[in-house]
From Swiss-Prot:
GO cellular component: early endosome; early endosome membrane; endosome membrane; late endosome; late endosome membrane; lysosome
Superkingdom to which the source organism belongs: Eukaryota
UniProt keyword annotations, A-Z: Coiled coil, Cytoplasm, Endosome, Lipid-binding, Lysosome, Membrane, Phosphoprotein, Protein transport, Transport
Protein name: Sorting nexin-16
Gene name linked to the record: Snx16
Subcellular locations according to the entry: Early endosome membrane; Late endosome membrane; Cytoplasm; Lysosome
Keyword Coiled coil appears in the UniProt entry: yes
Composition-biased stretches (Polar residues): 14-26
GO MF assignments: identical protein binding; phosphatidylinositol binding
Stated role: May be involved in several stages of intracellular trafficking. Plays a role in protein transport from early to late endosomes. Plays a role in protein transport to the lysosome. Promotes degradation of EGFR after EGF signaling.
Composition bias type Low complexity, residue spans: 27-40
Organism: Rattus norvegicus (Rat)
Amino acid sequence: MATPYVPVPMPIGNSASSFTNNRNQRSSSFGSVSTSSNSSKGQLEDSSVGTCKHTNVQDQMDSASSVCGSPLIRTKFTGTDSSIEYSARPRDTEEQHPDALNWEDRPSTPTILGYEVMEERAKFTVYKILVKKSPEESWVVFRRYTDFSRLNDKLKEMFPGFRLALPPKRWFKDNYNADFLEDRQLGLQAFLQNLVAHKDIANCLAVREFLCLDDPPGPFDSLEESRAFCETLEETNYHLQRELLEKQKEVESLKKLLGEKQLHIDALETRIRTLSLEPGASLYVSRAEGGQILRVQSSVLQVNRDVLDEESRADHKPHFNSREAGSAIADIEVAQLAYNAEDD
């Protein structure tokens, strides 16, 4: 893990010019997601951390855009590709060709992708917002609830006739409860939808700074931010790889079971095919008894053939006369009795 970056407090009055001259210097850190954004009077201030940044309205009007001071972990996604890259388009291109930007013509609703509870130095929750400036260009900014509240206060001053409702604060219960955070995420998403529904509000300076429309995040905003984001990606990648290995093991087990079942089905089909090719109609009766399989086979054609042979042999045999047989037996018995009487 990278060593936490500790911001150094800077005086606002003496160092304002140095911050204004170098527009690429940003003083956000991984522990202070919510740095300040410009108010309607032109002064930036952040009450959450010690880092501060000061510009004035005249400089912002001269440069036709302002510095986005709040995003912590920021990256840019191109299209639907999962590869990550940062915005490298120069500001001059955007200033010289304002027609190429379609945010003014057709603003897209920023999407809150989720939230994360940070515990680097002070525990707080950040919400990840996906901003789409065009179908080919989008990026992610991280905002705290206080950033939304500060933006809402600015919009009330700039547009008194509009009232954009924010989810209420929670004073006495746990602010890190999962159900509470999910409900707050839905409320913040509704806030963003109502915000971009009005063209004047969606294109005002405060909203453009909040979403970094004029200054898309780059790769060199903060070294600590880049390190923290890379560590988050590494941890996510590790968990995804473990989940992938578990799924692969499950797939291999199912493939093995499927192969065994297929072999059993093939064996049954082979046996059925063999029985259908045997001559004659054979009747098989299988019954499991005492752990053994008893097989009884009877051939109807063989039985019929044996019956016909026995009938034909019976036609050629001499007929037997029961009367003659009875007289012969009587003669033998009489002779035997006479012989026995002579012996006596």
